Amino acid sequence: LVTGVQTCALPIWLLEVSGNPDDETVGGFQRNAENPLEADVIIIDEMSMVDLPLMYALLNAIVPGTRVILVGDVNQLPSVGPGSVLKDIISSGCFPVVKLTKIFRQAGESDIIVNAHKINRGEPVVLDNKSMDFFFLKRDDTNMIISNIITLIQKKLPKFVSASEADIQVLTPMRKGLLGVERINKILQEYLNPPKPGKQEKEYGDHLFREGDKVMQIKNNYQLEWEITTRYGMTVDKGIGVFNGDMGIIKKINTYEETVTVEYDEKKQVKYPYNLLDELELAYAITIHKAQGSEYPAVIIPLLQGPRQLYYRNLLYTAVTRARKCVTVIGSESVFQEMIQNTNQQNRNTSLAERIREFNE
């Protein structure tokens, strides 16, 4: 356990934007070779999410002699941006690497961990529902799957994991389709947060936002202001910056001001003018890619037949490892087992490992 050490998200600590807030190139960062980060040791967690431009910006802002420790799992999904930085650094063979393989919890304590390791090794997972935290519901109909999802969120899982409905996350491989994010979100919105008199709504493009909705910020915005207030409206803290993947609840839609107020973790409230609503999406269900780097008390994973190029081992492994207390997979057992065997994840043509080796020759 390490205490008294500063921790901070890279976009907050490193990517302090000057000028254009949409510019995430090195030229838009205040931290660089002329204004480096002041640290003796830098530890980067969830390193598999870091792409080439971000890694370049980080290294450009580090002074010689600084120790850098990268922590990550190459078996999870690669970064959204270009490159496979962590994988290439490891495969270069030029840096000391420690691989953690031992499960320190008792084997019977968490089948989430045991099954995640089986998936990672390509071994079949026993789906007999004798587990206390890993469940499989065999279904072959999309409407039945969604009905089960609603029941789990409204009645079963909140008590089972001692969490609110908002803490239960549906993770799906796709945005489109009968079990895609867009369709599931519209259905769950009507069941989990139905309209009623006095509950304000706002239509924006293809989206309908309603007070009480669970939403996600889908791009970095370094200029948006947030504040924390008391119940009497006194401001106790404030700052700027809302980041891709942040999740919150719509607390108020003010039709007079034309704003939508979202409350994020730590009671941070952000007031969005209507013209920034394209930065928000409903988040009852999100893609597995969007969930990378996050954890939830319970996750629900709907799985039926889909494109083989989207249904691969790393995706399933990432989804399962998002849960702290409970995983429920609903759908086809054959699709689940086939995903474990499908290692045909789209390969990225990178040359970082070779260039590192050449530099060290």
Predicted regions, residues:
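Short glycine-/polar-rich loops that comprise or flank the Walker A/P-loop
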Residues: 39, 64-67, 93-98, 131-133, ...
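Single conserved hydrophobic/aromatic residue that forms the stacking wall/gate
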Residues: 1-8
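Conserved helicase motor core of P-loop NTPases
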Residues: 74-240, 359
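Residue-level signature of catalytic and energy-coupling elements of molecular machines
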Residues: 45, 73, 100, 174, ...
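Structural motif
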Residues: 41-43, 171, 216, 300-302
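ASCE P-loop NTPase helicase motor core
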Residues: 9-130
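C-terminal accessory regions
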Residues: 121, 237-240, 244-361
